[in-house]
Amino acid sequence: MVKRLIATSGFIALLACSAFAQDAKTVIDNATKAMGSLKTVEYSGSGFDFAIGQNVNPTQPWPKFIDKTYKRTMNFDTPAFRMERTRMQGENPPRGGGQQPVVGEQNQNQTTVVSANTPWVQQLELWMMPQGFLQAAAKNNATLATRTIGGKKYSVLTFTGQNKAKVNGYINDQNMVERVETWIDNAMLGDMLFDATYSNYKDFGGVKFPTKIVQKQGDYPILDLTITDVKPNVAVNIQPAAAPGGGAAQVATSEKLGDGVYLILGGYAAIAVDFKDYIVVIEGPQSEERASAIIAKAKELIPGKPIKYVVNTHAHYDHSSGLRTFMAEGATIITHQVNKPFLEKVGTMPHTLNPDKLEQAKKKPSIETMTEKKVLTDGNHVIELYHMTGIGHHDGLIMAYLPKEKVLLEADAYNPQPANATPPSPPSPYTLALVANIERLKLDVNRIVPVHYPADNRVVTRAELMRWIGRANGN
C-alpha cells in the first residue's frame, strides 16, 4: 500500500524541466477566468469520511463512516474554514478503529481560523481547493510544466509549501483544476502523498465548482463527497473555536505495579518490566515525543539496562507511531505476524520533511512476530502475549497479561469513561470480545491497564469492566 507514497526525484524533475508555451501567470489567469473568482464559499452534500491509520489490517482501506450531511464554509480572503457534518457508522459489523462503533448520529464541528501558528497541513484544506490552489499558486510564484497522463495533457502548476514540499495542481484543457497533490509528514509513513481530485464541475451563480471531491492519504480515500449545493461569495462569519483547556505538554509519570513492573502514564499508557539483563516495554504509541518520554522514564526506573523489546498491541497509527523511535533505540518490535510486512516498510520509509530519530540513525528495523501466544520470561518475570480472537478492531490485536501481578494491558477493546458514566446499551462488541477472550483463556485478572487510560488516573478493575458490559455482579 505504501509504494505510491514515495515522491521520487525523477517525477519532480520531470515537472520542473518540461517546456510549455504559456507562462504560469497566463495559466492561472485563464483558469481563474474559466472557474470564476471565489472569496468565500459554502458548499454542502453527503458522502463518506475514512479514518486514516485505523484499518482492520495493514492491507485494507481505512474504515468508512457515512456523512449523512456535510457542510463546509471557507473564507479565502481572511483564511478560515468551518466543517459541520452528521456522521454515522459505515462498517457493519464494525471493522477497524476510529472510535467505532458510532451509535446513532454523531454531530461533528471543526473550525480553523488561520494564524501564523496554524500547521501547514491544516491550511491545505483551503489551498488544495481548486480556487484556493490558484490563489496560492499566484502568491507563491508557481512554475509551469506540462504532463500527459492517460493520453490527457495537463498544465501543471507547482509551488513550494510551508513544509518545503511541492504542491502540484493539474489544470485540464477546459481550464479546470482537476487534481492537487502534495506531500505531508506522517509519523508512520514519512513523506506521505496527499492528493485531492475534483470532477463533475457545474455552474453555481457564475462560479464553476466540482460536485465530486475525493481526497486520499496513504493511498486510500479519506474523504469522498457528492456536492449538491454551492453558495459562492456569500457573507460568512467563521469565528475561532473556544481554546481547549489543558494545553500543557504531558509529563511521563509512573506507578509501581509490582516488583520491577512499572506503569508509565502521562499519555497513552505503557508498561516497563525489569528483566534480568534488559527492559521490556509494552506499547510504543502516539508519537516520537511520547515514545521518547516512555524510553526516558523506563531507563530512569530501570537504570543501566537496554530496552531489548517493545510489544506492539496492533498497527493502528495512534498505537504504533512511536515504534520508529524504539527502532532507533535498537529495540526489537514484537507484533502479530499480520503486521510484519507493513512495519518493516514503516521502518524504511523516507522521513525527509520532518526527519525523526530513525531517519538520522539509519538503523535497520528488527521485528519478531507471534501468532496466538508468545511468552517472555527471564525465570522471574513473565509476560504472556495473546492474540485476541473474535474482535473486529484489528486482525492482529494483542493483549499482554502479567500473571504474577494479575494485570492485563489491553488496547481499544475497553476505553474507560468517567467513573459515573452510564454503561452503553448495547455494549460495544469490542468490549464484549475482550471479556470473551479473558474468559476463554481463563486469565486471573484483577486489574485492567487500558492503553487509553482514564483521565482521572483511577485503578480500573475487572469488576468495573464487567459492570460496563451489563454484568453488574462482576461475574
Short names for language-model regions:
Residues C17-A21:
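Sec/Tat signal peptide C-region and signal peptidase I cleavage site
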Residues I222-F275:
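Zn-dependent metallo-beta-lactamase
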Residues E289-I334, R440-N446:
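Active-site metal-binding motif and surrounding structural segment of the metallo-beta-lactamase
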Residues E255-K297, L397-P416:
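Conserved beta-strand hairpin/beta-sheet module of binuclear metal-dependent hydrolase folds
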Residues Q22-V27, P94-V167, N172-D173, I184-M192, ...:
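Flexible, processing/modification-adjacent segments and terminal tails
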Residues T26-A116, N140-T148, E288:
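N-terminal mature ectodomain segment of secretory-pathway/periplasmic proteins
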